[in-house]
Each structure stands twice: as C-alpha cells, then as structure tokens.
C-alpha cells in the first residue's frame, strides 16, 4: 500500500474518501496513468479525422470504449461528454476537465476559464453515481491572463479538496513572454506554481532537452507531495513511446503519464492493447520489451 500525503485542506470527514480516490487513481502504487480525452475541444477535429487516423476515432464514443476496457487510472474529459455517454460506461474512472479552449485561440496570450465549478461536479457525481475520481484544470503560466487562471485554479483546488476530490493541474508555459515553451527550466518553474496551488498531480509537456538533468529539474520541483505526469504529445513510434515512459517513470522518478493521441488514434483493439501495455509499465514496472510483448499478444 502506497503511503498517501493527505493535504490539510481536506476536511477530516472527507479524508478517507480522498484516500480511496487516490488509491483508485494510482492502483495503490503512487503512480498514475491518465487517458486524456479533452482534445475534442482542445484540438477540434484535427486529432480525430484524417488520412492516417482510423475512422473509429471520428466517433466521440471511441474514447469511452477505450476507457471502459483499459487499465487506466482515469479518463480525463469534459463533463458534458461524461453526461452524454456515462450511463453506458458507468464503471469508467473519470476525471472531469473543468476548462478547455480550442486551438483557434492561439498561444500569444491564451485564456481558458472554467466551464463548471467544483460544487456542480460534486452534485453531478452524487446524482449520476458515476465513478468521479478527481477534477482537472489548465493554467497557462506566462499568459497575460495568468493571474485570473491562477486565482481560479487556487479556488478549484481548495473547493475540490473540501469535497475529497484530488486535482490534476495542466501547467503549460504560454504567451508572448515565453520564448521557448519546452525549456526544462521554465517547465520546472510552471511546476513550482502548480505545487504552490496545492495540486495533487501536475501534467507538463516533455522538455526539448531530454537529458537526465532536464527531467530531474522538472521532477524535483514537484517535491515529495505532488506527482509529475508527462504528456505523450503527438503520436509517436511505439518503441519510442514505451521506452520514454519507462525512462521517465522508473529511471527519473516521474509519477506517470497522460496520453491521448498516442492511444485513441488507433483502432479500438489496438488502442486497448496499447493502453494496457502502458499501464503495465507505469503500474507494474514492466520493462518496455515485456510491455511490447503484452501488446503484441493482445
């Protein structure tokens, strides 16, 4: 059983619920695999329809079919999608993404406000009886609108903790002031902001310099109480993906990964097999070669 740090803004009456949710997300390992499904807003239809993308992916339900048959910690997506499809996928572990913006809003100075508040998510969880394990929110560090998003994120973390809900913050350097959003030193700084906000987990993009020094700067910024997840990014070579995740988690000490396109831009059978191979690396400590054999077997 993994030892859980319970933040002091969790009420005594909600601590066991928070602990159960953390254990469900991490499968009692302290590590986390998020299946990211917020891109239908973030990337519009770019990720879901094209010559190299299976037609399966054009249907929003494809994400739910994958999530329902894969060993993920949680499926992160918008509440509206969960409300539409959740009755058919009631066993899926969900993380509600509270804000999203389309990629038509460029990086000059992005702003993404919350669509719902935590109280509404808690009410939805109670009424729907779905397995809502947490909430998520993106902060664009460096944007002119940073102050507004940081304030909103702080309120979300506090309110979520009051409900016993863990919080995953997407911490992305963006804006005219940012010269290189993939700079490891800058990403580590964004982690600092997320930790100060009280996030339980922080999702960041990979640095452009993938040396151990760069990764360690980012991961160390999370300290001992905040888990760092690296995004998978655009679809990549299978061996590279598995090797990268293993290295990030089991050599450098990251908490896990959040993958979207690398999973859902496959047929249903292939997507489920790939998700379970990633889970074997993150949760079971399987080597990339063993995970690849598992994938090919399925």
Question: What label would you give each PLM region?
Answer:
Residues 1-43, 87-91, 215-216, 294:
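N-terminal amphipathic alpha-helix/helix-capping segment at the start of soluble metabolic enzymes
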Residues 1-6, 255, 280, 286:
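Structured C-terminal cap/extension of enzyme domains
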Residues 13-22, 59-62, 79-81:
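Short alpha-helical segments and helix-capping/turn motifs at coil-helix boundaries
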Residues 37, 79, 206, 232-233, ...:
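Short secondary-structure boundary segments
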Residues 41-74, 81-104, 108-228, 239-255, ...:
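Alpha/beta enzyme core
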Residues 209-210, 233-238, 263-265:
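Short Gly/Pro-enriched loop/turn and capping motifs at secondary-structure junctions
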Residues 250, 264-298:
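C-terminal helical cap(s) of enzyme catalytic domains, especially alpha/beta-barrels
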Residues 256-266:
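Short acidic/histidine-rich active-site segments
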